[in-house]
């Protein structure tokens, strides 16, 4: 009798806050031998993808677990305002000032719009250390108490090693169990980055801890059968913060009463509510106690508030809804900087970028392109995928009236925060939006979004994609344009993430972005070159030049 083959298995490892350049550096130095051997080599190397805006923990998990952009499922940030409840009594006001950073953290599971999660689609799933648990079977959410206890202690005392060790032990313990999908989150890189900087030796130690855990899991799981497929990614990047420009505090100094977390949730007579995400982005809601439930559009936004914000040295851009919507009723978006103003809109199959004054997104002028083409074009700017991300954010009426994104090195929350965030994320800038994506299965050469990982895992597992629309695409449908006759060769474009046998862009430039010009070599040779990773190099010093 012929035996049926065992169903495929997959493991997703989320290294919260991992920067692609740091990961690349550590791989090149031989500091992550297990990742190199078991993931990067069989999958063809590391890709750099783009995450979502706001680029912050929890919100940026949604693409991996739902295949959707956060705005399309009603989650505009890690903090946001429920306009309807904000005009109620003190209990309603507390509920309205939504924050997934404290006791309301679990509410994200009910706030996400109805739709199947990865755990619904793959019932034989186990998750470790994730705040989003919707769809998990009873008992499939591991170490919830340890996550709560060690997570709180780590936030105030920096003891992320204990939390990562708990994750590693729980992960290794699953090797002998029956499952089809493991979803494993390591919070340490992000947590220590906030306390130090993205390249601090203590942060590097957290990357190594993840690699050690991967090696321990592989050693254990090989005793029980074949290896699963591995998918590894981060949810956002990070930058060191040199300037804290606390919008809420500055508005208060101007006499504008501002509701904000954590101590001014019930601010009496509040004219503005400031809801920070990742610290490098903030959403402003005007007249939060008015009872108005609909967002404001351009003509309704007080210029007396907006214009001074545009002069902030910390501001990369501001965005808000245009007065008009598209034919589907979705809002068009106005993008502002001190020097420029542009309109973003979407029609079936196309996104339109229309500069009205200057070029605030740095795209070179008017564009009307298919979504993935615009993604590719935007990768050469300092705000990759900004058009799509701003449109998806304002797709939910829960988003603020005005959204601000910071420049590198700046955020919108003061040093009073306990502990002070010496590094952070949340903005639309490249350093926050670009993330590493790797897999032990072949990856496409076209630009990848984190929202593509969920359908790719389903495709690998042989699970049908849900009937509802997904914002991501399985890897098999991301056909490289380098194979299309007459397509331009992009082998030395650092955002295209491939290298050519003839053009010979070094891997370090391919990943870190040292090269900047497009090659003129013919498309026929624009094929990916496999990068061989060192397996047994000695560990280098845990410091960066």
Q: PLM ranges: what are they?
A:
Residues 1-45:
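Active-site-proximal N-terminal segment of extracellular/periplasmic enzymes that hydrolyze or transfer
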Residues 12-14, 181-185, 231, 403, ...:
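Structural motif
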Residues 24, 30, 42-59, 78-107, ...:
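Secreted, luminal/periplasmic, and some membrane-associated catalytic domains
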Residues 60-201, 206-209, 336-380, 399, ...:
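His/Asp/Glu-rich, glycine-adjacent segments
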Residues 255-256, 261-293, 366, 422-460, ...:
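Substrate-binding rim/cap in mid-to-C-terminal beta-strand-loop elements of soluble/periplasmic
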Residues 383, 388-419, 426-466, 475:
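C-terminal substrate/ligand-recognition segments
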Residues 480-482, 489-510, 514-526, 530-545:
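Low-acidity, Ser/Thr- and Arg-rich intrinsically disordered low-complexity segments
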